[in-house]
Amino acid sequence: GTEPLMDEAIQKRGYVEVGYCSVMGTHDEVVRSLRPDNWQDNAYLNTWRIYQTINGMEVTGDLDFGVDATFGFTLQDRQQILTNKGEGITMEYGQLYKGDKPLIRLVAINKYAHWNFKPAARVIWDFFRHFSRDMKTKKLMYTE
């Protein structure tokens, strides 16, 4: 289970910030994407909550797919990206902020599994390229 990881995140809450980008495929049969019938104890949601905790952010509670049909809760900077991978295969993403810093980006690939999806690599890089760490203080830095 994720209890040991959550315990570690609770211990470090507020002492460290870590950027995180998660990519899920809505048709992945190995790591199931979020759905109204499976979100409780879902691996994606558990991981997002761990990163929210360690970053000292508000932790997502129960999901409501009426609020957001893909993720079940409100994300900022919500976007959809068309791909050339086939009919209906699009990417959606949004972000969670701590103050004015987007620390967590969540990406869903519609009608696709999550692995080896080259367009997702660009979305991931476009997120992480803004981060660096101050070598003295170890503080996470974010630049536009």
Stretches found by the model and what they are:
Residues 1-100, 113-114:
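The feature captures the conserved acid-bearing segment of alpha/beta-hydrolase catalytic domains
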Residues 22, 105-110:
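Extended hydrophobic secondary-structure segments that form protein cores and membrane-embedded regions
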Residues 109-110, 117-144:
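Catalytic active-site module of serine/aspartate enzymes centered on a nucleophile-bearing elbow/loop
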